[in-house]
Structures are given as C-alpha cells and as structure tokens.
Swiss-Prot record:
InterPro entries: GatZ_KbaZ_carbometab (IPR050303), GlmS/AgaS_SIS (IPR035466), SIS_AgaS (IPR035464), SIS_dom (IPR001347), SIS_dom_sf (IPR046348), Sugar_isomerase_AgaS (IPR014180). It comes from the Bacteria. Its EC number is 3.5.99.-. One of its GO terms (biological process) is phosphoenolpyruvate-dependent sugar phosphotransferase system. It comes from Streptomyces coelicolor (strain ATCC BAA-471 / A3(2) / M145). Pfam families: SIS. It catalyses: D-galactosamine 6-phosphate + H2O = D-tagatopyranose 1-phosphate + NH4(+). CDD domains: SIS_AgaS_like, SIS_GlmS_GlmD_1. Belongs to the SIS family. AgaS subfamily. This is Putative D-galactosamine-6-phosphate deaminase AgaS. The lineage of its organism: Bacteria, Bacillati, Actinomycetota, Actinomycetes, Kitasatosporales.
Length: 385
C-alpha cells in the first residue's frame, strides 16, 4: 500500500474507490460551475413550474440515488415552500398508481449514476402514463445512459449532466451521490447557492488530505465491530441510510449496518446493539433538532464501551462530550442537506477500511456477481396487462 502526498492510502483492490472518494471536492467545484453555466436554461425550465401553486415535486432514484432524494426533501420543501416528496423508483415502478395517486402537475427529479438501471427509465415512463402533466429534471452522471438519451431535447424535460468523472467506476456510488445531491440543491434551492460549494469542498479537503479522518476511520474498524449504527435527523437521516448502505455494499454484507433517526432508534431498532457495536451520530446544525442528536449521543455513551460512539458535527463543545468528535470544519451555519456532503466522506472511509479489513476488494466486493454495479435481473411489467 502506498500513500501519495495529499491523498488517501491506496492499493490495487481499491484504485477506483479511493480516487472517487478523494476527487469529490474538485468535482463539487465543477458541479458549481456546471449549474452556474446552465442557470439561464435551468431557470427558464424551473421557474414557471415552481411558480405554480399546485405543483408537486417528486425526488426519485434507486438505492443511493433514492437517498439523495431523502437528504434533499426537507431542505427543498423549505426552499420552495411547497410539497416535496422523496419516492424511490423501486416504489414508483411497483405501485405507480399509489405513489402518484393525486393527478397533480408534477416535477419528477430523477437521480441516476448510469441511467441504465431498469427502474430509472421505467419510472419516468410510468409517470408520463399515470399523470396528466409531468415535467422531468434528470440529474445523471452518464451522458450515454438510456435515461439521459431518452430525455435530451424532450419539450418537458431538462437533463443536467454531472462531471464525467462522477460516473464512478468503483462498485459503490461515492462521488456520483454527492455531485447529484449538490447539483439539485444548487438548481432548486436558490437560497443555498452563494459560495456553498466552495465551503463544502474546503471542508472535505481538510477531512481527506490531512489523513486524520482515514486514521480515525481505521481505528474504528480496528475495534472489529459486529454491528454499526448510523443515526441522523431530518436530511441527516437520509445520510444515515446512505452511510449504512455503503458499509453493507463494500463489506459484502458481512458487517451489519443499521440506519435510523435519532428519535426513531429507541422504537425497536435499538435492539441491534450489543457489546461489539459502534454508533455514528450525525449532529444537525439546526439548534432545535440537534438537541435530540445530543440526547442519543449521551444515551449511547451509557450503552456502549468507550470509543464506540462517534459524533460527526460542525459544532464544538457541549452536547458531544464522551463521544469521539469527528469535525466538519467551518460549516456551523450551513443547512443539513449541504452538511451531508462532507459528512458522508467519513462513512465512505469507514466502509472502505472495513472492506479491506475483511480481505475484500472495495472496487468489486462481489466478484461472483451476487450484487451488480448496475442492477440486473429486473423484469418490467406492463401497467395495463
């Protein structure tokens, strides 16, 4: 294993995954430029829709792409002052009449790394079939993907392409997730535009480049946990879901990973804890919400051995005593949907190191093909049969 200056340690089992984690700050700056250059066309497409009082916004994707919607939903609902729902494509395809029961004018925001997953195109087609009026904002990392090709130059569609490098070659979505999430926040959350991408990039660079985060993630993995719990509130619950999925994917399902909200964890999911568990709590920047995050940190301190509870936080001081504090420097005033982007780097590093500790190859933890980078094996059925 080598350690090039200013980067993460890398070996041939994780060439793509390491590069794709490390490239995120640079790609976020590129996303900011892309959205800025597309601003006139984006506003021409979005502003008349958002001005309509009856518009419903639906954020959709599968797996990690669905969690992008979950991170964004509370924030965009506030920014837009209207109903915003996060509905996975996997739900929408299985039950389109239920997910789209109200025949309202709808903006369907589709997130897709490749755009070639069976549900990606099917979800947009079913929305067209079920609803009287639907408009599509497609945010994807693959210009050649079927989703991008089918919606390019359609009159009610706008395709926003991410940097080519964000079409992750590693098994797990890393830079694709953060780039698409940032792009949607910049495109739709107008109050979040000014300078936020640069601030997030600088924070992530400080996490990645000094090596401390990688060492602390490695130290957590060295505890040989049997179970890992990720908790967060509001947008950070979506981040907790994405974090747990990263660990499950890169460890080939050998490390049990659970996600919940800080309040919801007590209502049954807390049963997962044993003496070989570790917990990561994402602490909200909202002064009201983070009280609940502080409460669960304090409770977990009493349940788990010293060193087993991590608080990922932009704040310093009260509320996280007794927990290992993993910082998000200079971001104490940003909204939680934006905070999620540098915060997820910690989960990506945990997943990477846990995978390697198990002798797996993070770039392909399922060499026999039990789980695929682009989902296979889905049979799509006609709605009218």
């Amino acid at each position: 294993m080598t350690t090039p200056p200013g980067t993460l340690p890398v070996d041939d089992s994780a060439v793509h995954t390491v590069r794709e984690i490390a490239q995120q700050p640079a790609l976020w700056r590129e996303v900011d430029r892309i959205v800025g250059a597309s601003r006139e066309a984006l506003d021409a497409f979005l502003d008349p829709l958002v001005a309509r009082g009856d518009l419903r916004v639906v954020l959709t994707g599968a797996g990690t792409s669905a969690f992008a919607g979950q991170v964004l939903q509370p924030s965009l609902a506030r920014h837009l002052g209207r109903r915003v729902d996060a509905v996975p494509t996997t739900d929408l395809v299985a039950d389109p009449r239920g997910c789209l029961a109200e025949d309202l004018p709808t903006l369907l925001v589709s997130f897709a790394r490749s755009g070639d997953s069976p549900e990606s195109v099917a979800a947009t087609a079913l929305a067209d079939q079920v609803l009287s009026e639907v408009h599509h904002l497609v945010i994807t990392c693959n210009e050649q993907g079927r989703l991008a090709r089918e919606h390019t130059r359609r009159p009610r569609s706008h395709v926003l392409l991410m940097p080519a490098a964000s079409n992750d070659r590693g098994f797990a979505m890393t830079s694709s997730f953060t780039c698409m999430t940032l792009a949607a926040l910049l495109a739709l959350g107008k109050d979040a535009r000014d300078g936020v991408a640069e601030r997030l990039a600088r924070a992530a660079e400080s996490i990645i480049e000094d090596g401390a985060a990688d060492r602390t993630a490695g130290a957590l993995v060295d505890r040989a946990p049997e179970r890992i719990v990720f908790l967060g509130s509001g947008p950070l619950k979506g981040l907790a879901e994405e974090s747990a999925l990263k660990v499950l994917e890169l460890t080939g399902g050998t490390l049990m990973a659970v996600a919940e909200s800080s309040l919801g964890f007590r209502h049954g999911p807390k049963a997962v804890l044993n003496e070989r568990s570790v917990a990561v709590v994402y602490v909200s920047n909202d002064p009201y919400t983070r009280r609940y995050d502080h409460d669960i940190v304090a409770e977990l301190r009493g349940n788990l051995p010293v060193g087993s509870v991590v608080a990922v936080s932009a704040e310093s001081g009260a509320g996280t005593e007794g927990a290992d504090a993993w910082p998000l420097p200079g971001l104490g005033d940003v909204e939680d949907a934006a905070l999620a982007l540098p915060a997820v780097v910690y989960a990506q590093l945990i997943a990477l190191r846990a995978s390697q500790a198990r002798g797996l190859r993070p770039d392909n933890p399922f060499p026999s093909g039990e789980v695929n980078r682009v989902v296979q094996g889905v049979t799509l059925h006609s709605l009218n049969d």
